[in-house]
UniProtKB/Swiss-Prot annotation:
Involved in cell death (apoptosis). The active site is at 244, 300. This is Metacaspase-1A. The gene is casA. Residues 1-16 have a biased composition (Gly residues). It comes from Neurospora crassa (strain ATCC 24698 / 74-OR23-1A / CBS 708.71 / DSM 1257 / FGSC 987). Disulfide bonds: none annotated. Keywords: Apoptosis, Hydrolase, Protease, Thiol protease, Zymogen.
Amino acid sequence: MSYGYPGQGYGPGGGHHQPPPPQWDGQQQHHHQGGYGYSNPGQGQYNPQPPQDQGYGGYHQQPPQQYQQGSYNQGQYPPQGGYGGPYGQQQQHHQQGHSQRPPGPPPDGYDIYGYPIGSGHQTRNQGSHEIHEIPSGTQQFGHGAPEGYGFQYSNCSGRRKALLIGINYLGQDAELHGCINDTKNVSAFLVENYGYKREDMVILTDDATNPLLQPTKENILRAMQWLVAGAQPNDALFLHYSGHGGQTKDTDGDEDDGYDEVIYPVDFKTAGHIVDDQIHDTVVKPLQPGVRLTAIFDSCHSGSVLDLPYIYSTKGVIKEPNLAKEAGQGLLAAVGSYARGDIGGMASSLFSVAKTAFGGGNEAYERTKRTKTSPADVIMWSGSKDDQTSADATIASQATGAMSWAFITAIKANPKQSYVQLLNSIRDVLETKYTQKPQLSSSHPIDVDMLFVM
């Protein structure tokens, strides 16, 4: 039995849509430190309109196995945008001297910049800075590392899927004004610049008429499972969340500051929040090597909401390693060598520390597998550090999340950047209006001078 098109309601097995949660009483905000979006409520408010695209975000395939009682039916989608759409036209106008994307989807065997995949090209960008190619195959720490440990980059040439979540908390005391706009802006950006298709997107917003497309806790977790189901090496997955975030007391000892980061679904009052550990277990842990997940979280306290252990500064070095996640593994010493290009030092530091701590390579390997390090290629751009709040901005008279706006603006200005260049570009954009500092985190040590793709 199918769930039906938007507005047709549930079929059997789908449950019932929760009524709007009660008003926030203000006591729920004690960890929000003001929360996302406590700007002047009279400035640039977003007045939600009925969705123009009723089929936007419909599931086009079976959800994960445990949800086979029902599936989303695909509605009618708007015309597909090509690489040369409105954003592409703006790029051609503003990007004199920058490498530009071709006017249409890349041919088989070529990346979105027109280079043959695996050609080993290197470019120079932003002065004399060299952007490194994306290596293929398993990346090992070197001889002497725990047997079997490695990770694999994705060249993002495979299938693309996206999950976009925007929650304005309509009618609640802590209502936001830019989150639904964020999903519209990001979806258009992905279609017009990165070859994503609307039928491969799920968009959850609290102005949706289909109860299954409301950003409830159940729907968010189901959609996260759909996003990662069946992912193969070199696939490109994209996860975007714009809404309230906060912190709650850590219960499993994996957070340095004693708090887990959480996101708040629209029905948090009745269903509760979603903790970072659960998000990690749902969208990071199932991924196999070589699968890319790019995530953007535009919320308060979002710096480690995916529980990724490697956090990078604008200089391209690990800034705030989550020691509790990787304690005793020897991985941090190895990563220091990796950043310096010292493969031998990387291997010896990893092996010696792990062997001393755990008595041998096999035991260290088993322990390593239980950490948050992942062989998949998971990258997160977050709108604030864990101790910061995010800004609900008004850009060009349209309410929007500051991080979402800065990410799109930075890439449109120069689509060919390394990871560290893009992190600096995003911060430069934000600094024109805001004090928050976005950050880059990953599931494995990365070469921050490598070309960013998604």
